[in-house]
Amino acid sequence: EQDRYQAIASDFTALSPQEREATLIVAGTNEARHSINEMVRKRMRLEGGLKYTVLENVDATRAQLKQPATYAPDLVVSYHREGQNIQRGVDYAVVGVEGDQVVLRGSDGQNVTVKPAQHFSATLHKKYDIEIAPGDLLKITKSDKQLGLLNGDRVRVQAVSAEAVTVKTERGTIVAIPAQRPMNLQHGYATTIHSSQGLTSNRVLIEATVRVAHTLGMT
């Protein structure tokens, strides 16, 4: 597997900057996506990077989201609907479980309690650290109306600091993404088959097997 990932990273970085802009790497799994993204970044020798905490979606069924035990400490949850004590689209850190309730902490530092059996229309995220450097390609994983960013946007890093990651969108706008809290983004060189649906690209490098690759409808 690692040899296959290295071959794809090599093929991608051998392209001209213009060709890379029009090329999408499609991976079969999140593990493959992580590995290929790291290999591409090493080959590109990006400098001046800083470490940031980002959020990645955790797969959970509707039945699992109704169970308090699903909400492990250090996970982050965002709700798709307003409810008692909770706001739609806000990221809440999981503090712990008390009986049939989950204790969450909002951005204001205040704790709230939620019953998952009643409020299960949600997305779980896990936190992990990545390095981001000027020149990096990132993919936005959650829309932010305030910043003018859309889920799926591919953005190019212009500058990094302890306070923010400044990016340029494909629409040409410059946006400073605050870095004080975990950010909803990931490296954007490789994406999974699921996340690639709806994207268009002039060139596609496929890590996955032919069996799953034929489901792609990109041009």
What do these predicted regions represent?
Residues 1-151, 156-158:
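Conserved helicase motor core of P-loop NTPases
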Residues 103-117, 162-179:
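Short solvent-exposed strand/turn elements
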Residues 116-124, 179-188:
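Structured surface patches comprising rigid loops and adjacent beta-strands/short helices at the edges
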Residues 142, 169, 208:
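Pocket-edge structural micro-motifs
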Residues 183, 207-217:
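Conserved RecA-like helicase motor core of SF1/SF2 enzymes
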Residues 189-197, 214-219:
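Conserved SF2 helicase motif VI
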Residues 199-209:
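A short beta-strand element within the Helicase C-terminal
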